Design a protein with these regions (language model features):
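Active-site His/Glu-centered metal-binding helix of metallohydrolases
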Residues: 431-432
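Alpha-helical transmembrane segments and their membrane-interface boundaries
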Residues: 257-393, 397-401, 405-419, 423-427, ...
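Hydrophobic packing positions in regular secondary-structure scaffolds
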Residues: 1-264
Length: 446
C-alpha cells in the first residue's frame, strides 16, 4: 500500500474516528499494518481503544497485541477470552507469543497453553523459562541447522525443501549430533561455494554465540557493534536453542529509550492511562522531590538572619543553584550515555572526570564574569557581584562530582541511574549552591 495513503488512514483513525461509522473504521483498519493499528490504539483514550480493537479480525489481534506497550497490552488482554487469545497468537513467532503470555496471570497462562498443540506448548514453555530481559527471552526457535559433514549441495537441497525460510535468515548454524553449536555459514557463502565442498571447510567459527542469560541491553550492543542481522543463542551446555533477529533488537532499543525517558520523569508509558494509574506512577518521584526540596529549604533556613538583613540575596541565590543543576544534568547525561553504551570503565573514568572538571572551570570563569557584571549593574554592589561569581564557580565544580559520582554509585547499588540520578544531582547542586553563596555572604557581608 502507498505510504501516503497509509498515513492518511492512520490520521483519520486518530483524529476523526468519532465521525465515522463502525464499517468505515473497520475498512480503514483493514488497510493498515499491525504497527500502525497499534499506534492508533496508543493514541486513543481507553474507551475508544477498546472499540477499535474489537473491530479487528481475530488473526490480526496477535500482531497488534505484540506491537503495543505493556500497559495497554495488559488492559486489552483482560477483555479477551482465552479461546480468542489462543486463536489470535497461534500464527505469531515464539518470542512474540512469549512476550504476550508472560503478561498474563499464571493460571490464565496455563489455560492458554493447554489449548495449544504439544509441540507449540513445549516451545513456548521453554521460552517462558527465561527472563524477558535476557537473550533467552528474545530468542526464536525457528532456526535452520546442518551438520559439519554435510556437503554444500545437500545444504542447498535441504533449504529448497523448506516451505519458506524463517524471517531475517541471513545464515544457518552448524551443530553436531548433540546439537552443540559449532559455527555458522552465511546464505551468500552457501550460494557461491562449490557444491561439492563440505560444511566444515567453509563454516565460520570466529563469532561466538550469545548465552541465553545475557542481558538484552548487552545483546543490543553486540548487534550494533557487529552489524548483525541474526545471532545464535546457546544454553549453559553450549547447545543451540534458538536465534535472535534484528527486529527483536530494535524493539529492545526502542523500549529501553522509552523507559529511560519516562523513568527520568517518573511517569507511565500509557499517554491515556486513567488518572488513578497515572497518579500512582508519578507519586513516588514527586514525593522524593518533595524530600529533596525540604533539604534545600533547610539549607536556606540556616542563613535566615543573613537573608533578613540583605534581602536581595534571596533574589540572587536561585541563579547559583539553577546553573549548577543544569551543569550537573549535562554531565549526568554524558555519564548515562557512556554507561548505556558500555564505554565507561575504571581505566577511563579518571580522564573523563578531568575533562568534565576542566569544562566546568572554563564555563565557570566565563559565566561568573557575565553574572558578576549583571549583578553589579543591577545592585551597584561590587562585593555581592564577586561573591555570586565565586559561588557560581564552586557550584559548577560540584556539579562535576555530582554528575559523575551519583550515577556510578546508583549503578553499584543495582539501581537505574537514569531514573533516580537527576533528582539526586539537582539536590546536591541546590545545597552546594545555597551553602556557597549564603556562606560567603555571611563571612564577608555580616
Amino acid at each position: 500500500m502507498d505510504n501516503v495513503e497509509s498515513k492518511n488512514n492512520l490520521k483519520i483513525i486518530i483524529d476523526d474516528s468519532s465521525n465515522l461509522s463502525l464499517n468505515q473504521i473497520r475498512n480503514l483498519l483493514n488497510k493498515m499494518s499491525a504497527s500502525e493499528i497499534a499506534h492508533a490504539l496508543e493514541s486513543s483514550p481507553p474507551k475508544q481503544r477498546g472499540l477499535l480493537f474489537s473491530l479487528l479480525k481475530t488473526e490480526e489481534e496477535g500482531d497488534v497485541l505484540f506491537e503495543l506497550g505493556e500497559e495497554i497490552q495488559q488492559d486489552l488482554l483482560s477483555n479477551i477470552s482465552n479461546e480468542e487469545l489462543t486463536e489470535a497468537v497461534k500464527e505469531l513467532e515464539l518470542d512474540e507469543i512469549v512476550d504476550i503470555l508472560q503478561n498474563l496471570p499464571e493460571e490464565r497462562m496455563k489455560k492458554i497453553l493447554s489449548n495449544m498443540s504439544m509441540v507449540d506448548r513445549d516451545r513456548i514453555e521453554m521460552g517462558l523459562t527465561f527472563p524477558d530481559d535476557t537473550a533467552g527471552g528474545l530468542l526464536n526457535t525457528d532456526v535452520i541447522s546442518v551438520r559439519p559433514d554435510n556437503s554444500i549441495n545437500e545444504v542447498i537441497s535441504y533449504l529448497r525443501d523448506q516451505k519458506e525460510l524463517p524471517e531475517n535468515t541471513d545464515k544457518i548454524f552448524v551443530v553436531n549430533h548433540e546439537n552443540e553449536y559449532l559455527g555458522e555459514i552465511s546464505i551468500g557463502k552457501i550460494i557461491t561455494s562449490d557444491p561439492s565442498m563440505i560444511v566444515r571447510e567453509i563454516m565460520e567459527t570466529e563469532f561466538f554465540p550469545l548465552d541465553a542469560g545475557l542481558n538484552d541491553k548487552e545483546v543490543a550492543t553486540i548487534f550494533e557493534r557487529n552489524d548483525l542481522i541474526s545471532s545464535s543463542v546457546i544454553d549453559e551446555n553450549g547447545k543451540l536453542i534458538g536465534r535472535i533477529t534484528i527486529d527483536d533488537v530494535v524493539d529492545v532499543i526502542r523500549e529501553d529509550a522509552d523507559q529511560n525517558l519516562l523513568g527520568m520523569a517518573g511517569v507511565a508509558e500509557d499517554t491515556f492511562a486513567p488518572p488513578g494509574r497515572a497518579a500512582k506512577s508519578r507519586v513516588f518521584w514527586l514525593s522524593m522531590n518533595l524530600v529533596t526540596a525540604f533539604i534545600a529549604a533547610s539549607t536556606i533556613n540556616l542563613f535566615q538572619d543573613v537573608i533578613d538583613k540583605i534581602v536581595y540575596l534571596a533574589v540572587l541565590m536561585p541563579i547559583v543553584a539553577s546553573m549548577g543543576g543544569v551543569a550537573a544534568t549535562q554531565t549526568l547525561t554524558i555519564i548515562l550515555r557512556g554507561l548505556t553504551l558500555d564505554q565507561i570503565n575504571t581505566k577511563n573514568i579518571g580522564w573523563l572526570f578531568k575533562r568534565e572538571l576542566a569544562v566546568s572551570i572554563l564555563n565557570g570563569i566565563v559565566l561568573s564574569i557575565l553574572v558578576g557584571f549583571i549583578t553589579y549593574a543591577w545592585f551597584q554592589d561590587i562585593t555581592i557581584a564577586i561573591l555570586i561569581s565565586c559561588a557560581l564557580v564552586i557550584n559548577l565544580i560540584s556539579s562535576v562530582f555530582a554528575g559523575i559520582v551519583v550515577p556510578l554509585i546508583l549503578r553499584k547499588l543495582k539501581q537505574d541511574p537514569a531514573i533516580g540520578g537527576s533528582v539526586v544531582v539537582t539536590t546536591v547542586t541546590d545545597v552546594v549552591g545555597f551553602l556557597s553563596f549564603l556562606g560567603l555572604a555571611t563571612i564577608y557581608l555580616i
